[in-house]
Curated annotation (Swiss-Prot):
Phosphorylated on serines in the serine-cluster region (poly-Ser). This is Dehydrin DHN1. Belongs to the plant dehydrin family. PANTHER family: DEHYDRIN RAB16D (PTHR33346:SF37), DEHYDRIN XERO 2-RELATED (PTHR33346). The gene is DHN1. Residues 115-147 have a biased composition (Low complexity). Pfam families: Dehydrin.
Amino acid sequence: MEYGQQGQRGHGRTGHVDQYGNPVGGVEHGTGGMRHGTGTTGGMGQLGEHGGAGMGGGQFQPAREEHKTGGILHRSGSSSSSSSEDDGMGGRRKKGIKEKIKEKLPGGHKDDQHATATTGGAYGQQGHTGSAYGQQGHTGGAYATGTEGTGEKKGIMDKIKEKLPGQH
């Protein structure tokens, strides 16, 4: 092995990559150790006596090669939101950013009115008539007046006021 080329075996090979673009098969990685002939030790990218650049840290760094995967996108599939939705006429249309955000927020579906009359709000606070948090001594009946059987959603302020003591 020449001086200045320690830990550089295998970096000249190209084309030996797996399906994700990672190098495979006999590629050894250097550690960026001592470089003879320069009078210095260690360091990334220092030139040896013969002009070989040192790669430190034991990491493979390809020189601006693009790895194509044949047009196949590898996705995790963990997200449930889609960038398009049914347009009602058998086709699809792209969703806007606003629609994507509304889809992820709890209770943000204005088109879905089927669950509001039976289950209450987003966190089930609508039908409770008993004593609220930390309010001992109150007998129920004073908390959900006005929205009990109408199927209307309570506003955020109404929910907060309901939980405050002495505000009825």
